[in-house]
Structure formats: structure tokens, C-alpha cells
Amino acid sequence: MKKYNYDRLKDAYRQFSAAETEYMKACNQDDEQNQWEKEEILNACTDILTVTVKDVLEDEEDFIQ
């Protein structure tokens, strides 16, 4: 795997993991607005991670062929 792709995956996963942690913390509070905001951030990070994985797989596939 190219280092560039590894770094992209690592960064996207780091962002997702941090957002997931913040969302879980928010779920333990009574502040519904905060929960909603953290869920929106988590959803965005999930989308970013999904797109990054797709892009990296396509790039690595091109690299292998």
C-alpha cells in the first residue's frame, strides 16, 4: 500500500473514531441538542471514511494492475 493511501485511511479513521467517542459521551447526557450535533458529526465522518476507503481501494487496484 502506498504511504499516501495509508495516511489517508489512518486520518479518516482517526476522525471517525474521535467522533464516535464524542457521540457516545453525548448519549450519556440529557442534552438532546448536543446528541444531535454529535450524531451529525459522526455521520459526516462515517461518510468521509466510506469515501476514503473506496478511493484508496480504487487507487490501490490501479496500482496493482
Predicted ranges, named:
Residues A18-Q65:
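Short, charge-rich amphipathic interface segments used for partner binding and complex assembly
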Residues M1-N28:
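N-terminal acidic leader/helix
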